[in-house]
Amino acid sequence: MEGGWPARQSALLCLTVSLLLQGRGDAFTINCSGFDQHGVDPAVFQAVFDRKAFRPFTNYSIPTRVNISFTLSAILGVDAQLQLLTSFLWMDLVWDNPFINWNPKECVGINKLTVLAENLWLPDIFIVESMDVDQTPSGLTAYISSEGRIKYDKPMRVTSICNLDIFYFPFDQQNCTFTFSSFLYTVDSMLLGMDKEVWEITDTSRKVIQTQGEWELLGINKATPKMSMGNNLYDQIMFYVAIRRRPSLYIINLLVPSSFLVAIDALSFYLPAESENRAPFKITLLLGYNVFLLMMNDLLPASGTPLISVYFALCLSLMVVSLLETVFITYLLHVATTQPPPMPRWLHSLLLHCTSPGRCCPTAPQKGNKGLGLTLTHLPGPKEPGELAGKKLGPRETEPDGGSGWTKTQLMELWVQFSHAMDTLLFRLYLLFMASSILTVIVLWNT
């Protein structure tokens, strides 16, 4: 009795090796006596069921060919922070079992049966990128044809790793891969093929996909690489799945409000520079824009730096620069109306040059100084820009930086005119920078 258990182990091992290494396998005869109009006696396939632990072959040197296809029925979510794609698909496997064969004419016309998949040998096909445990439900069935062809459909919820690039968010396209491979069988034992053409897989997936949410399917391509691990070579089929984000939600909730606020900020330059409402108005816009960014933060990706974040930072910077320009002009007007300093000669000459008719420099707006009740036509001293340009100034009038011929009122008028010219110049520079920046972002989004 002491040597009984090792002897049984040796016998079992010899039986297994003989089944695997034999040059020809035994062919099982399907007895049609078990077929009738009410079904099939399971005992008819019992010999096949008993060998479900072994790959079915009649010649060990010939690998089993497994044809693969799948249908992508839902894109459940994309996690940019974890770089994961969650999808639902049906995986279809087709292979031949040489031990299953019957004549439908002799078997009451039955040419196809459904059998519990757990009673058959199943290829160990898995998705390489999958980051989750296989949760295939139990009790699935497989179709068996009279020629021994087996078709096995398997529903799968796949959480797969995907290299996500969110730089072009929300106009981004992602390319994820599903790589089907065998975990155990090398190319000597199993080869993978296509059950359907790629265009058929794409068309079927587009028709049956049930999610009309954030992502849409663009197309599917394939490649057939080989994976080498040590001395073993495994066959693979790699599918490239291209998906695109639907940007409507983000355009309506992010881009349109942001563009409106920036446009209103630009239009606020048309408020009179002497008005006390321009600076508070711009401050209110700036605070409102910050509140808008805080409220919409949940719609932005949690990782990376998408181009839309650069766009928001650019808009915020433009509003800050606009406010600083208003502060600068307000300061110039304050100095001009309280204690105007002597104007340097070069600045006075530049002002005369720029305000002369036909010049390309920005002309100072002919706005009244509402705070003083003065206008350029009512202030004594210097003439209008046109008159100043056409008149040869006397020796005393050509020295605004120290000559005694210039009164405080005349200096005030010059500094107010200079402030208006600077306001116009800075406004044009602001518009130029804003237009070029926004066009650059749009071009980057379209590349």
Curated annotation (Swiss-Prot):
Which protein is depicted? 5-hydroxytryptamine receptor 3C
Q: Which PROSITE patterns match?
A: NEUROTR_ION_CHANNEL (PS00236)
Say what the protein does.
Answer: Forms serotonin (5-hydroxytryptamine/5-HT3)-activated cation-selective channel complexes, which when activated cause fast, depolarizing responses in neurons.
Q: Where is the composition biased (Basic and acidic residues)?
A: 384-399
Tissue-wise, where is it found? Expressed in many tissues including adult brain, colon, intestine, lung, muscle and stomach as well as fetal colon and kidney.
List, alphabetically, the SUPFAM superfamilies matched: Neurotransmitter-gated ion-channel transmembrane pore (SSF90112), Nicotinic receptor ligand binding domain-like (SSF63712)
User: What does the entry list under GO cellular component?
Assistant: neuron projection; plasma membrane; postsynaptic membrane; serotonin-activated cation-selective channel complex; synapse; transmembrane transporter complex
Q: Which gene encodes it?
A: HTR3C
What does the record give as the organism's lineage?
A: Eukaryota, Metazoa, Chordata, Craniata, Vertebrata
